[in-house]
Structures are given as structure tokens and as C-alpha cells.
Amino acid sequence: MSSPIPSSKPGQRAHLSNGGVDFLLEVIDGAPVIRYWAASFKGELSQNLFDRSIANSDFDEITSPGIMREHSRGHLGYPTIKGHRAGLDWSTKFSVKEFKSDKNSFQIQLEDSDAKLTLDISATLDQFGVLKVSQELTNLGDTYFLDELNYWMPLSDCATQSLDFVGRWSNERNPQRRDIAIGRYVRDSHEGRPGHNYTIGMIALEKETNFASGQSWALSLAWSGDSQYCIEKNYEGSASISAGEVLLPGEVILATGESYRAPDLYALYSNSGLDGLASNMHKHLRARSLHPKSARPMTLNLWEAIYFDHNEEKLKKIVDAAAESGFERVVLDDGWFGSRRSDLSGLGDWQVSKEVWPSGLGSIANYIRDKGMEFGLWFEGEMVNPDSELYRAHPDWILKVNNRIGPTWRHQLVLNLDNQDAYNYVLDSVDKILSQYQITYIKWDHNRVLVDAGSNNRAAVRKQTQGLYRLFAELKKRHKSLEIESCASGGARIDLGIIDLVDRFWTSDNNDALERARIQRWSAQFIPPELLGTHIGADPGHQTGRSLSFSFRALTALF
């Protein structure tokens, strides 16, 4: 038996149209329902397009492809929201309370008066066809424990495959494409950062879609902590795509009147292949007021040239060669501070080492500037070696649960940015070095994942991520011309959450041009090339031992 989905009330309908994309949303039985998300169309969509059959042994009313996927409305898949009040109010049924829309945006407030919750959802479709969506949950009752709040978007029946990325250190962004099968396919990160084996976004596409043609839909979450993407398909063939922050137990506990704002979501559509999808995202990001306006300086990072062997006279010879070759920026990497003669010690002691730089960094910084180049410096402010003056003085400043010390990674632990004293130490230490040496560029590394990431014994990945955002924002406030390069053992923290606070991503620690061609190509599926750090790799490559021609290595770095 075929049954129509009920029509919406007058005025409770949003038809967004911009950038060659149309997005149609209606309120059905009090719930916001996404009717259409694809290429722009003229006229009206036929009601027959939404008719669905009701099988025997099924609900007597149609379950609509709503934003709010709730069991109370007969949705049997994964829900939009999970939470409770000490086991109560675990089931919600939100209804639209306020609804506003224009050609390019909508704002909806939903309320569940029984559960005493409101949810504000807003979206804007820009001139490039990129839909930016936000969600904010407010608690109007007693203490509410939020476990999950996800974004969900329905997929066209044409979307029969998914594309995401996997990898490891020095081998990021390997594409994996698969058929969308019945069930729930999930990609999630539990590292306290996106990670090497994670995806910048999830893509659904037609089987025939290639770089130049075919339809594709994509989600990318603006968040640098734990997160997840998934595609779910039921037995009737209806599929949806989702993204959301992964919340650890107790990370979001809302008192009366408190709110949780989810990380923003970017939703993209293209009918001109994967390149069309990338082009739309690049145009959107380039239109930001924060996007770099000047040509990107040609940068020499000294890490693979010297590693921990800091010698001023040796470095000056390299600087001379860099100036003659047309470089515009020289970055001094790890090893300039404390007892940091290897990765075993000194991390966290952000004072210039008198052992290797007895007169400070002023001499080499001025030498570089006198050659007409900019001086940049490496930091890893979120981390600490157990063998360091900082850790010996403040062992309680790390992320931990009770007195349990987690496993080290590259011989280091993670400082707790939710601890105000630790946060102030990092901020003030970096600020002092930047001011003392007039530094306008830093490479900020992150070489350990977050495990047992507790603050006052409570899960703190969310607070740690927010602390990093606050730290970067404050550094840029104090140093107006500062540019930050985001690095995390290479490309393990490339995302749309941190992008407004940084000016470049280090794409991978692998500088082998053959490997880099793939890594850069797929990183550019979401991130514009001018924001992706590239180097002309050594010969032979330090990661692969492979010898490649200079022209190939140079062209790969340039393009």
C-alpha cells in the first residue's frame, strides 16, 4: 500500500537555493523533514516523489527522513540525540516551536516540553553551494547528561557508494571506496585529534562518479577532538549520512539553563564529480576573512637538514644557500630549548638552551632576517617529557585519571590545558619567546594521542580541544601578524575546526614525492592547496629511502 507523507503547515517550509544547490525542508507533524538536497531545480517537486509504501508488519504511519531521528516517532535507526536525567527523560519527541527562513537560510527552535529540552538549529547555504549547519541544545530542567548529539542528512537513492580515508604516520589519506550496504558504517576517532587513520570528511557518491562527473554528497565536521562519521542504510533502501562529536562519559552535563553547542557541520553537494565537490569547499574557505590573502612564502624547515644537531655556524651556511635559492622563510624545528638533545627529554622546558644557543636565538634570527627572510620556530606546547624540569616540578599538570600515568608516546605525556596553571604556563612561555625574538611564524606540533585524558578525574578531551582553540586565539590576539602551522606527527590534525586559527597544515611527515602526490591530492579534497605545507624532499627520501629526480620532487612540492 502506498501512502503519502503528510504535507507541511503553511509557512513552515524552507527552500534554500544558492550556488547551484537546492535544499528543501518542511515541517511534518511537528518535525523538520529534509525533502531534497541536490542540484537546483525549477518549479515544484511533485508530492509523488515522497510517497512510500507501507508494508505488512510496519508502523501505520510513514516515518519521515527527519533531522530529529527519534524512536518516539518510529525511527528504528541510530538516533540524533542520546541523553538522560539519572535514567529518566531518555526518550525525546521534539516539535517545532519557532520557524524562520529566507532564500539562503533557516532557523528552527524545537522543544520537548516533557524532557524539558530545546534544540536550536540554523543553516546557511552560501554562494558556493556549501551548507553550514549549527545545533545548540539547552536544558530547561534538572541536570541533564548528554551522551550524543549528531547531525543527520538523508541521501539520494543514487548514492550507492561511500568514500573516506585511512592511514598511519607518514601514510595519510589513503582513499577507500565501498558500496553502501545495509547497516551502519562508522568512522570514528578516539585520539583527542582527528588522527592519521581518520577522515577529514565522509563522502557519499554514485557508482559512476569520478573526478570530473557524477553526483556526490559530503559532510565535514568543524572539530579537532574526538568525532565520528557514519552512513546508515535500512532494509527498505533509505540511507542517511551523519557526523558528530564523540562525547566521553560525563563530558557534557547540563545544569538548568546551560547549553551545549555542537561543532558546526559543513554539508556539500556536487554534480560535477569529486573535483566539483573540492572546488566548492575551496571557494567557501577562500571567501573567509581569515583566509591568507598574501602569496604563501617559500619555506625552508630545517628538521631533516639537522634534526637535533643544532650548530650556529652550520646553520648559517644552510641559511646562505636558502637565501641564494629564493627562500622567504626559515623555520628552526625541534631541539632549540632545555635539555632537548633528543626526543627523550626537555619537552615542556620552553627556555632557549644555553648548551646549543649560548647567546640565545637572536643571532641566528637576525642573520636570517638580514638575508631578507622570515624566522619561524617550532613548539609542541601541549606536551611534556617526564624527563623535564617542568614535569619534575608539576607532575600533576598532565591529563590523567586518579594517579595512573598513561603510556608514553614518543617519550611524552599531555599537559592538561583545562588546568589553568598549566594553560598559563604554556601561553606565557610561548608568548615570551615570540616577543623576545619578534617571531611571526610558528610550527605547532602534537606528537601524542590522548588516552586516559582526565582532568580532575573527569573525561576532558572536549575541554582540551577547547583549551587549544583558546590558546591559539590568545596568541594571535597578542601577536597580530603571527601565523601558525598546525602539525600533528604530520597530518593528524587537519580539520575544519582548527582551520580558522591556523594558516597552514603540515600535510605529512613523509616528504617522498611519490607518496606525497597521493597524500596532497586527497588532503585537497577538502583543504585548499595553499594551506597544505609541502617540502622538496631529500634524495634519497628519509622516510622511504627512495631516490627520485629533483624535478619530480620540486614539482610535487609546488603543485
Residue ranges and their predicted role:
Residues 60-94, 206-230, 268-290, 327-334, ...:
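Glycine-rich, aromatic-flanked loop segments that form ligand/cofactor-binding clefts
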Residues 94-96, 252-270:
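Short Pro-Gly-centered flexible turn/kink motifs
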Residues 253, 261, 299, 329-331, ...:
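Structured core elements
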Residues 385-424, 465-559:
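Glycan-recognition surfaces
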